[in-house]
């Protein structure tokens, strides 16, 4: 297999050198030879295996490709992930944090069953069947974390992040949230919704330090990154 030249752009996140001008990113495989969503596996010049991170299947991946400047998830980070779905993005987050826990909350039992297939090989993914709007449900499982990542398609997306931060996020920790405008209101201008959600985050205790629109990968979506200042 041809060895690929990689450049580390964030801790444990790599960009592939390509001739076509397209930005491609990858994470080092925590579980070699194991695909999660049909992603391509490559070998780096260090003879280690890497997984291509498809931005069409991951809002965090899309934000990185679109120029995210602040990426607080790194090796050793303790992460609370709200809305893990079938586990595409959490699997890459688990690659990044290596042995540190990724507390993985999902509300739908059917989807959680799919996620269990992902987590069985990645021991740092801790599956939690729970409701992100009610953090007390999993307060006996989740410890204080460095980062909360939220991808929950509900009207009160920003409030969910603030409430979970009050329970679990350390002082000076980071919140990352993918805002889906159409989940808040299908009729209003997405830009108005983004600004409204941003203000809720600020009033709740976050200092917004980065924001990235993730089109064309996801329509009417933005990703905010904020530093938590406990009230």
UniProtKB/Swiss-Prot annotation:
S-adenosyl-L-methionine binds at residues 88-89, 106-107, 131-132, 151-154. Its EC number is 2.1.1.-. Keywords: Methyltransferase, RNA-binding, rRNA processing, Transferase, tRNA processing. The keyword Methyltransferase applies. One of its GO terms (biological process) is box C/D sno(s)RNA 3'-end processing. Transmembrane segments: none annotated. It holds the Pfam family Fibrillarin. GO terms for molecular function: histone H2AQ104 methyltransferase activity; RNA binding; rRNA methyltransferase activity. Interacts with nop5. Component of box C/D small ribonucleoprotein (sRNP) particles that contain rpl7ae, FlpA and nop5, plus a guide RNA. Belongs to the methyltransferase superfamily. Fibrillarin family. Involved in pre-rRNA and tRNA processing. Utilizes the methyl donor S-adenosyl-L-methionine to catalyze the site-specific 2'-hydroxyl methylation of ribose moieties in rRNA and tRNA. Site specificity is provided by a guide RNA that base pairs with the substrate. Methylation occurs at a characteristic distance from the sequence involved in base pairing with the guide RNA. This is Fibrillarin-like rRNA/tRNA 2'-O-methyltransferase. The lineage of its organism: Archaea, Methanobacteriati, Methanobacteriota, Methanomada group, Methanococci.
């Amino acid at each position: 297999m041809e060895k690929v030249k990689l450049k580390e752009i964030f801790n444990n996140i790599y960009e592939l050198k390509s001739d076509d001008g397209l930005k491609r990113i990858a994470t080092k495989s925590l579980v070699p030879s194991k695909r999660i969503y049909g992603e391509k596996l490559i070998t780096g010049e260090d003879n280690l295996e890497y997984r291509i991170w498809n931005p069409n299947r991951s809002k965090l991946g899309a934000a990185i490709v679109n120029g995210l400047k602040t990426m607080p998830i790194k090796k050793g980070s303790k992460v609370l992930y709200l809305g893990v779905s079938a586990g595409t993005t959490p699997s890459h987050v688990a690659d990044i944090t290596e042995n540190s826990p990724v507390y993985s909350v999902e509300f739908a039992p059917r989807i959680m069953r799919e996620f269990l297939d992902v987590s069985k090989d990645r021991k740092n993914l801790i599956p939690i069947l729970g409701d992100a709007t009610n953090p007390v449900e999993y307060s006996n499982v989740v410890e204080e974390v460095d980062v909360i990542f939220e991808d929950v398609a509900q009207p009160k997306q920003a409030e969910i992040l603030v409430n979970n931060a009050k329970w679990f996020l350390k002082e000076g920790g980071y919140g990352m949230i993918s805002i889906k405008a159409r989940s808040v209101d299908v009729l209003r201008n997405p830009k108005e919704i983004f600004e409204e959600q941003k203000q809720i985050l600020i009033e709740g205790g976050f200092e917004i330090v980065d924001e990235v629109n993730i089109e064309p990968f996801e329509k009417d979506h933005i990703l905010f990154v904020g530093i938590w200042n406990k009230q």
